[in-house]
Protein backbone atom coordinates (compact mmCIF):
# COMPACT_ATOMS: atom_id res chain seq x y z
CA UNK A 1 0.00 0.00 0.00
CA UNK A 2 1.29 3.45 -0.90
CA UNK A 3 2.07 5.77 1.99
CA UNK A 4 0.57 9.26 1.94
CA UNK A 5 4.02 10.86 1.62
CA UNK A 6 4.63 8.78 -1.52
CA UNK A 7 1.28 9.88 -2.94
CA UNK A 8 2.19 13.54 -2.37
CA UNK A 9 5.54 13.13 -4.10
CA UNK A 10 4.02 11.19 -7.02
CA UNK A 11 1.30 13.83 -7.28
CA UNK A 12 3.98 16.39 -8.15
CA UNK A 13 4.81 14.57 -11.40
CA UNK A 14 4.26 17.11 -14.21
CA UNK A 15 1.84 14.90 -16.14
CA UNK A 16 -0.20 14.32 -13.00
CA UNK A 17 -0.48 18.08 -12.46
CA UNK A 18 -1.50 18.84 -16.05
CA UNK A 19 -4.10 16.06 -16.07
CA UNK A 20 -5.59 17.36 -12.79
CA UNK A 21 -5.82 20.81 -14.37
CA UNK A 22 -7.96 19.33 -17.17
CA UNK A 23 -10.04 16.92 -15.08
CA UNK A 24 -11.83 19.52 -12.97
CA UNK A 25 -13.43 21.27 -15.97
CA UNK A 26 -14.05 17.80 -17.47
CA UNK A 27 -16.28 17.10 -14.45
CA UNK A 28 -18.76 19.52 -16.04
CA UNK A 29 -19.47 17.19 -18.99
CA UNK A 30 -21.44 14.65 -16.92
CA UNK A 31 -23.52 17.50 -15.50
CA UNK A 32 -24.22 18.74 -19.04
CA UNK A 33 -25.31 15.28 -20.21
CA UNK A 34 -27.02 14.28 -16.96
CA UNK A 35 -24.77 11.23 -16.56
CA UNK A 36 -23.63 11.45 -12.96
CA UNK A 37 -21.79 8.12 -13.19
CA UNK A 38 -19.38 9.90 -15.54
CA UNK A 39 -18.55 12.33 -12.76
CA UNK A 40 -17.81 9.43 -10.44
CA UNK A 41 -15.47 7.90 -13.04
CA UNK A 42 -13.64 11.20 -13.49
CA UNK A 43 -13.36 11.66 -9.71
CA UNK A 44 -11.99 8.12 -9.35
CA UNK A 45 -9.35 8.83 -12.00
CA UNK A 46 -8.53 12.09 -10.18
CA UNK A 47 -7.94 10.21 -6.92
CA UNK A 48 -5.90 7.44 -8.59
CA UNK A 49 -3.55 9.76 -10.50
CA UNK A 50 -0.70 9.68 -7.96
CA UNK A 51 -0.64 5.89 -8.23
CA UNK A 52 -0.36 6.04 -12.02
CA UNK A 53 2.79 8.17 -12.16
CA UNK A 54 6.29 7.67 -10.77
CA UNK A 55 8.05 10.19 -8.60
CA UNK A 56 9.24 13.12 -10.73
CA UNK A 57 12.82 12.79 -11.99
CA UNK A 58 13.70 16.21 -10.63
CA UNK A 59 12.24 19.47 -9.48
CA UNK A 60 13.05 21.56 -12.53
CA UNK A 61 9.73 21.27 -14.37
CA UNK A 62 7.30 24.15 -13.88
CA UNK A 63 4.32 21.97 -12.92
CA UNK A 64 6.38 20.02 -10.37
CA UNK A 65 7.52 23.28 -8.76
CA UNK A 66 3.94 24.58 -8.85
CA UNK A 67 2.58 21.42 -7.16
CA UNK A 68 5.28 21.62 -4.47
CA UNK A 69 4.44 25.31 -4.03
CA UNK A 70 0.76 24.42 -3.60
CA UNK A 71 1.71 21.99 -0.83
CA UNK A 72 3.62 24.78 0.92
CA UNK A 73 0.74 27.23 0.36
CA UNK A 74 -1.75 24.78 1.89
CA UNK A 75 0.16 24.84 5.15
CA UNK A 76 -0.33 28.63 5.41
CA UNK A 77 -3.08 29.82 3.02
CA UNK A 78 -3.73 32.97 5.04
CA UNK A 79 -0.09 33.96 4.55
CA UNK A 80 -0.84 34.66 0.88
CA UNK A 81 -4.16 36.52 0.65
CA UNK A 82 -3.84 36.97 -3.13
CA UNK A 83 -3.44 33.21 -3.59
CA UNK A 84 -6.41 32.61 -1.30
CA UNK A 85 -8.49 35.09 -3.31
CA UNK A 86 -7.52 33.34 -6.57
CA UNK A 87 -8.60 29.97 -5.15
CA UNK A 88 -11.89 31.36 -3.81
CA UNK A 89 -12.68 33.01 -7.15
CA UNK A 90 -11.73 29.85 -9.03
CA UNK A 91 -13.99 27.69 -6.85
CA UNK A 92 -16.84 30.19 -7.23
CA UNK A 93 -16.45 30.19 -10.99
CA UNK A 94 -16.52 26.37 -11.09
CA UNK A 95 -19.72 26.44 -9.01
CA UNK A 96 -21.19 28.90 -11.52
CA UNK A 97 -19.99 26.67 -14.37
CA UNK A 98 -21.86 23.75 -12.79
CA UNK A 99 -25.01 25.84 -12.89
CA UNK A 100 -24.48 26.68 -16.58
CA UNK A 101 -23.66 23.03 -17.37
CA UNK A 102 -26.95 21.96 -15.78
CA UNK A 103 -28.79 24.56 -17.86
CA UNK A 104 -26.79 23.54 -20.96
CA UNK A 105 -25.72 27.11 -21.60
CA UNK A 106 -22.59 26.50 -23.65
CA UNK A 107 -21.40 30.08 -24.05
CA UNK A 108 -21.39 30.93 -20.33
CA UNK A 109 -20.04 27.49 -19.49
CA UNK A 110 -17.09 28.08 -21.83
CA UNK A 111 -16.50 31.54 -20.34
CA UNK A 112 -16.48 30.04 -16.84
CA UNK A 113 -14.07 27.25 -17.83
CA UNK A 114 -11.64 29.71 -19.45
CA UNK A 115 -11.82 31.98 -16.39
CA UNK A 116 -11.31 29.05 -14.00
CA UNK A 117 -8.31 27.67 -15.87
CA UNK A 118 -6.79 31.15 -16.20
CA UNK A 119 -7.18 31.91 -12.50
CA UNK A 120 -5.83 28.52 -11.50
CA UNK A 121 -2.78 28.85 -13.78
CA UNK A 122 -2.11 32.27 -12.24
CA UNK A 123 -2.38 30.64 -8.80
CA UNK A 124 -0.01 27.85 -9.85
CA UNK A 125 2.44 30.43 -11.21
CA UNK A 126 2.42 32.18 -7.82
CA UNK A 127 2.96 28.84 -6.08
CA UNK A 128 5.88 27.91 -8.37
CA UNK A 129 7.44 31.32 -7.77
CA UNK A 130 6.95 30.94 -4.02
CA UNK A 131 8.56 27.50 -4.12
CA UNK A 132 11.52 28.88 -6.12
CA UNK A 133 11.95 31.71 -3.59
CA UNK A 134 11.84 29.26 -0.70
CA UNK A 135 14.44 26.99 -2.31
CA UNK A 136 16.70 29.95 -3.08
CA UNK A 137 16.38 31.54 0.38
CA UNK A 138 16.15 28.30 2.38
CA UNK A 139 13.29 27.11 4.61
Task: List each language-model region with its residue ranges.
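Hydrophobic core of alpha-helical transmembrane segments in multi-pass integral membrane proteins
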Residues: 43-50, 88-98, 113-123
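Core segments of transmembrane alpha-helices
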Residues: 19-28, 83-98
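Glycine-rich, aromatic-bearing surface loops/beta-hairpins
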Residues: 104-139
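Juxtamembrane helix-capping/reentrant segments at transmembrane boundaries
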Residues: 65-85
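Structured domain cores in non-transmembrane regions
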Residues: 38-39, 52-55, 81
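Membrane-water interface of transmembrane alpha-helices
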Residues: 49-65
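Helix-coil boundary and interhelical linker segments in multi-pass alpha-helical membrane proteins
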Residues: 28-41, 97-110
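Long, highly hydrophobic alpha-helical transmembrane signal-anchor segments
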Residues: 4-37
